[in-house]
């Protein structure tokens, strides 16, 4: 029995050192050296101060800002500790009621409802933390944002186009607009205007 315990303890200690200390240390050094921005949370700074992350959505509800996907996290929106599959199923009657309420909120905010509403403006994301919307969802909001900021719709549309990221490597994913980056670009454009 003692002959079995010694190798087990040695293997346990070696694996603990390798997987608990060495591997995390090597990955941390590698991440900081090769991908420093991503390793530190992809933080977005304004005036030398972190204002958010490019990877986690934030609530914007003022008419002068583009609004992101809705967050279904609890107890508050965009709560990273509450992230996870929180959408209702497509056959759940509560989903239809929530979508109707969200469309009414868009109408109350002065959004033109004569055009079809992009689905990502009225449904929550699976994680509840999506930082991006589709170009269609951004284009849908251009008139409202331009009016609230006293800018031309063309100026705002150009900012949307400038902040639209294409597919990764030209084939992966869909074109998308990071809401935080777009709203910061809007603030900068208005300050320069």
Curated annotation (Swiss-Prot):
InterPro entries given for it?
KdpC (IPR003820)
Q: Does the keyword Transport apply?
A: yes
Recorded GO molecular functions are: ATP binding; P-type potassium transmembrane transporter activity
Q: Any idea where this protein resides? A: Cell inner membrane
Would the keyword Ion transport turn up in this protein's UniProt record?
yes
Please provide the record's keywords in A-Z order.
Answer: ATP-binding, Cell inner membrane, Cell membrane, Ion transport, Membrane, Nucleotide-binding, Potassium, Potassium transport, Transmembrane, Transmembrane helix, Transport
Which cellular component terms (GO) are annotated to the entry?
plasma membrane
Residue ranges spanning the membrane: these are 7-27
The protein's topology relative to the membrane is: Single-pass membrane protein
Q: What is annotated about its quaternary structure and interactions?
A: The system is composed of three essential subunits: KdpA, KdpB and KdpC.
Please give the family membership noted in the entry.
Answer: Belongs to the KdpC family.
What PANTHER family does this protein map onto? Answer: POTASSIUM-TRANSPORTING ATPASE C CHAIN (PTHR30042), POTASSIUM-TRANSPORTING ATPASE KDPC SUBUNIT (PTHR30042:SF2)
Write out the function statement from the record: Part of the high-affinity ATP-driven potassium transport (or Kdp) system, which catalyzes the hydrolysis of ATP coupled with the electrogenic transport of potassium into the cytoplasm. This subunit acts as a catalytic chaperone that increases the ATP-binding affinity of the ATP-hydrolyzing subunit KdpB by the formation of a transient KdpB/KdpC/ATP ternary complex.
User: Could you identify this protein by its name?
Assistant: Potassium-transporting ATPase KdpC subunit
Gene for this protein?
Answer: kdpC
């Amino acid at each position: 029995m003692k002959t079995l315990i010694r190798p087990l303890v040695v293997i346990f200690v070696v694996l603990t050192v390798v997987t608990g200390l060495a591997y995390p240390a090597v990955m941390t050094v590698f991440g900081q050296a090769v991908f420093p921005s991503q390793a530190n949370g992809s933080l977005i700074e304004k005036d030398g101060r972190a204002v958010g992350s490019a990877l986690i959505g934030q609530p914007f509800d003022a008419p002068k800002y583009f609004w992101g996907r809705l967050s279904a996290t609890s107890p508050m929106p965009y709560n990273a500790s509450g992230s996870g599959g929180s959408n209702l199923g497509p056959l759940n009657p509560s989903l239809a009621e929530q979508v109707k309420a969200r469309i009414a909120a868009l109408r109350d905010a002065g959004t033109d409802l004569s055009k079809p509403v992009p689905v990502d403006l009225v449904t929550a994301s699976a994680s509840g933390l999506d930082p991006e919307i589709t170009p269609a969802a951004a284009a849908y909001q251009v008139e409202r944002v331009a009016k609230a900021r006293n800018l031309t719709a063309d100026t705002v549309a150009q900012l949307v186009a400038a902040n639209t990221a294409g597919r990764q490597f030209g084939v992966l994913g869909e074109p998308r607009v990071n809401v935080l980056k777009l709203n910061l670009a809007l603030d900068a454009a208005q300050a320069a205007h």
